[in-house]
A protein has these predicted regions:
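Flexible, glycine-/basic-rich loop-and-beta segments that form/coincide
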Residues: 237-271
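S-adenosyl-L-methionine
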Residues: 109-162
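Short, glycine-/aromatic-enriched active-site segment of Class I SAM-dependent methyltransferases
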Residues: 183-200
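A basic, amphipathic helix-loop patch mediating RNA/tRNA/ribosome contacts
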Residues: 1-51, 85-86
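Conserved SAM-binding loop of SAM-dependent methyltransferases across substrates and taxa
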Residues: 93-104
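A short glycine-rich, Lys/Arg-flanked "PGG" loop and its adjoining helix->strand segment in the class I
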Residues: 161-178
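Short beta-strand element of Class I
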Residues: 33, 106-111
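Conserved class I S-adenosyl-L-methionine
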Residues: 82-92
């Protein structure tokens, strides 16, 4: 019956095919979701409980592809999160949170300004504190009363310039963080192209250096830099910066130009 039909992305969540609508949309975009044997191309397609919905792609390790970003940081920066108290800034579906837990974190504060996005799998996990509808820029010890060992930041529509000063007081001395540098939210409107994509490597270099400067001003040392293994939703190349909260703040002079060049070469080869 027509009144029982729902958007297929919402139906995928209620039927357990996907952990969240955001993830369902990713799965549909991959071309691996089938409705009654036919490929689904739009998340807004209507379907009912009686329809056969299948996902034929590879099973993923995390609730969202965000986990792959932190996974690379764990591997490249040689992070050990065993027994750590962590903060996931911009948690969304919880890919970073999931990766933290799978790498031994004992507790994760999942912070996001939105609501209803965190995967049900993570919401029901006793190790996860869901801080939805929380603007991290104005967060206090009331929301996070204990100092963290590690934090990650994957935020949109705001510069890390405003996130890092709020993060520093919440980390233990000697604590560390991995932040995703998104050129489209750091470069300024004049440097952002169509569909919000920043392609110019020179702008990427400038953006990364600016973020490193923000980090030092907020009480961090810049330890390492690499590029994210997956692009942003509109195709932006993004970068992973590894920070440490030290008594002496410094930039260990990561090869910014080299990392940017390697990132562009990697994604160009994959096109």
């Amino acid at each position: 019956m027509e009144e029982n039909r729902k958007r297929i992305d919402a139906l995928m969540v209620s039927l357990g095919v996907a952990p969240s609508r955001e993830k369902a949309k990713e799965m549909i975009k991959s071309g691996n979701v089938y409705l009654n044997g036919k490929v689904v191309s739009k998340a807004g397609l209507l379907a009912s409980d009686c329809d056969i919905i299948e996902y034929k792609g590879e099973s993923e390790r995390y609730v969202s592809r965000g986990g792959l970003k932190l996974e690379k940081a764990v591997e490249v920066f040689k992070l050990d999160l065993s027994g750590y108290l962590c903060i996931d800034i911009g948690a969304s579906t919880g890919g970073f949170t999931d990766c933290m837990l799978q790498n031994g974190a004992k507790k994760v504060y999942a912070v996001d300004s939105g609501s209803g996005q965190l995967s049900p799998k993570l919401k029901s996990d006793h190790r996860v504190i869901d801080l939805k509808k929380t603007n991290f820029r104005y967060i206090t010890e009331k929301e996070i009363p204990e100092r963290a060992d590690f934090a990650s930041a994957d935020v949109s529509f705001i510069s890390l310039k405003y996130i890092l000063p709020a993060l520093s007081p919440l980390l233990k001395d000697g604590g560390s963080a991995v932040c995703l540098i998104k050129p489209q939210f750091e470069a300024g409107r004049e440097n952002v192209g169509k569909k919000g994509v920043v392609k110019d490597p020179r702008v990427h270099i400038k953006v990364i250096k600016n973020v490193c400067s923000y980090a030092v001003q907020a009480g961090f040392s810049v330890s390492a830099l690499d590029f994210s293994p997956v692009k942003g939703p509109e195709g932006n190349i993004e970068y992973l910066v590894y920070l440490k909260k030290d008594e002496v703040q410094s930039v260990s002079a990561p090869d910014v130009a080299g990392v940017v060049s390697a990132a562009h070469a990697c994604f160009k080869a994959g096109e």
